[in-house]
Amino acid sequence: MASNGSFSAQRNANAGTTMKRRNDNRGYGGGIGCYQEERNRYAPPQKRFRSQLQQQFRSGHNPLYHYGSNTNNNVSRVSSQSYNNYGVDVIASNSSFALPNNDSNTNNYQKPFVVYGNPNPQIVPLPLPYRKLDPLDSLPQWVPNSTPNYPVRSSNFVPNTPDFTNVQNPMNHSNMVSVVSQSMHQPIVLSKELTDLLSLLNNEKEKKTSEASNNDSLPVGLSFDNPSSLNVRHESVIKSLYSDMPRQCTSCGVRFKCQEEHSKHMDWHVRKNRSVKTTTRLGQQPKKSRGWLASASLWLCAPTGGGTVEVASFGGGEMQKKNEKDQVQKQHMVPADEDQKNCALCVEPFEEFFSHEADDWMYKDAVYLTKNGRIVHVKCMPEPRPAKDLREPSRVMSVTVPSVAKAILC
């Protein structure tokens, strides 16, 4: 059908007006207009399509659109379905779309108009402008310099190589030289005062580094020329004492590097404590280490060979008596035994106290009756009797016993 058909007058009459769109109730279940109030309240808002621009046709006239469900073999559908409430918009199949910038016959473009009936008209995309490329045959072809395959017998043969000696170098141009010279960093010119200051700072820095290297080379603790150096914190010494020896004994504070040495040291502490407890239980005093420093009398008597001289205490006789009493009390105490809480002779309980020196609970004024026997009080202990000499003959003592008869007579 031609573009100037019978419907052109109706289309032109409605060109400046907006036609009312029908209610779209597809998929709701009711007919057109059913439950319109509920649908407008609960249904989600529908997307409204904006009017699109119609493209130009080769004929130069507006396309003919039909409103209705007309099935014609000479027309092609653009955008619709048979079950919707919209009219079927068709376009004549014999009219073809024209591509812009390719039709040299006409340059007049149609004005945009409102599409009637179809809310989503189909738009034909426009191609991008292009430039016609040259064919491959017109491109330059690179032909390398080929050397002959036959062997060269002449010693004066020179291969066919390009000569670039006569070609001008663009970098040697005067303008290029000026640009390169401007882009290069120019040397910084410093004043004399600033140069002297920088040299002085560099000399001081070098001096400090040399002193630090000399101090590191000397052993720690052997340089006493500068008293302030004794207060310097030596990180190497601290690291060797703490970081290099992380394991420390909780009893004496000795540090070790590995776990094996630490375990051996702890075993030695256990054996020492057991031996001390055994000796105190047997009534023997544990052996104490000698004093760190000798007394003045020992120093005076040592050159003459007089031996050790006991030094009198500063407190006089009272202090000496108190010390002797304390020593006696220390001798008369034994480790506490849960099986023997009462004296074996008087059956009275012992006085128990904790000794910080022995690090154990002890019985006060108590001794062993025998070496491994019962525990008794010191006051309950029988006095020792002198042993008789069996080699001497026993002497018969004469005892005068008054006769019974004489006593009776008197």
From Swiss-Prot:
**Entry keyword annotation includes Transcription:** no
Name the UniProt record assigns to this protein:
Polyadenylation and cleavage factor homolog 5
Keyword annotations from UniProtKB, A to Z: Coiled coil, Metal-binding, Nucleus, Zinc, Zinc-finger
Does Zinc show up as a keyword for this record? yes
Q: What quaternary structure, including any partners, is listed in this protein's UniProt entry?
A: Forms a complex with cleavage and polyadenylation specificity factor (CPSF) subunits CSTF77, CLPS3, PCFS4 and PCFS1.
Gene Ontology cellular component terms for the protein in this record: nucleus
Zn finger (C2H2-type) ranges are: 247-269
For the region Disordered, what residue ranges are annotated?
A: 1-32
Q: What organism is listed for this UniProt entry?
A: Arabidopsis thaliana (Mouse-ear cress)
**Where does the record place a coiled coil?**
191-214
The opening ranks of the lineage are: Eukaryota, Viridiplantae, Streptophyta, Embryophyta, Tracheophyta
Q: List S-S links within the chain.
A: none
Domain of life, per UniProt, equals: Eukaryota
